Design a protein with these regions (language model features):
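N-terminal, positively charged nucleic-acid-binding surface of large information/translation enzymes
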Residues: 1-135
Length: 135
């Protein structure tokens, strides 16, 4: 047995496998039972995820994985509540415009969510500050 658990190598290996298998993408048509898991969409308004974000996302992820492992077709989407005061206030704090800061913050949050290993169907990602969201 190894003296030290190399979590970075092990987690990277499994996350790459999940990505290659497109494990968390919802099947469009299937006879499997359906399950829908939804978290609140985070405000892209800070330097990164907090423990509070994890406290909210991990239980939903556990429920979705459990259903997936038990044969359900799981829809677990995510997105960004990026149109409002939190995003605007963060942009003001940074001396910038939300059109510039929101994509940067979203990229950071998304990278961190992937590091945590949350199983979102990223093909269904939405952003409330995008014009297409309102069509």
């Amino acid at each position: 047995m190894a003296e030290k658990y190399d979590f970075q190598t092990i987690e990277k290996k499994w996350q790459e496998r999940w990505k290659e298998a497109d494990l968390f993408r919802t099947e469009e048509t299937t006879a499997k039972p359906k399950f829908y898991g939804l978290d609140f969409f985070p405000y892209p308004s800070g330097a990164g995820l907090s423990v509070g974000h994890c406290r909210n996302y991990i239980p939903t992820d556990v429920a979705c994985r459990y259903r997936h492992m038990n044969g359900c077709n799981v829809l677990h989407p995510t997105g960004w509540d990026a149109f409002g005061l939190p995003a605007e206030n963060e942009a003001i704090k940074q001396g910038s415009h939300p059109k510039k800061t929101v994509p940067q913050i979203i990229a950071t949050y998304k990278r961190q969510m992937n590091l945590i290993g949350i199983g979102y169907d990223w093909s269904r990602e939405i952003n409330s500050s995008e014009p297409d969201y309102y069509k």
